[in-house]
Amino acid sequence: FLKKDDTLTIGTCDNGMYYSQAKINNKIDKSDLVIWTFKNNKIVSKNPNMYGYVRTKKPDNAIFVSCKKTISKVPGNDHTIIGAFSFKKAETFLKYSKDLIKLNKKINKEFYLDSVAKLCVSSKLTVKVNLVNKYIGWGTPTDFINNMVIKN
């Protein structure tokens, strides 16, 4: 049972990441939503429009979210959305997910949490990015094979 004041983190199952638990806890405490991101990973260059992106204002405040569309000419340098999101309160996730469905804001005929994050940013909630130390994607068979042995 999900309580409205519960902290809620939602993520995909086709990746792994290294991150600082203390850093993410601090960001969750200071924001309504944290979008988990990575940068400078060659995986993005294969199909840049397969990802979502976040434009930030220093140091880590999200000011724009794009789903399945690049935001610059060099997407590898941008905050790329991992597919993990931490909501300080579950009620924020529930409210903005319901709004997304009510507005029928689909991308490629599907609803995405990237779009929930975009609604949160446009509603002036405090949204931050959490740039992970390392991202390991295994969303495609090639990615899985290439990342079976993870090098530190």
Q: Residue ranges of each PLM-predicted region?
A:
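Conserved beta-loop-beta/alpha segment of the NTase-like Rossmann-fold superfamily
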Residues: F1-Y53
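Catalytic-core segments of class I nucleotidyltransferases/pyrophosphorylases
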Residues: N25-N26, K58-I136, T142-I145, V149-K151
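A short acidic, often aromatic-flanked loop/helix-cap motif at beta-alpha or helix-coil junctions
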Residues: N41-I43, Y135-W138
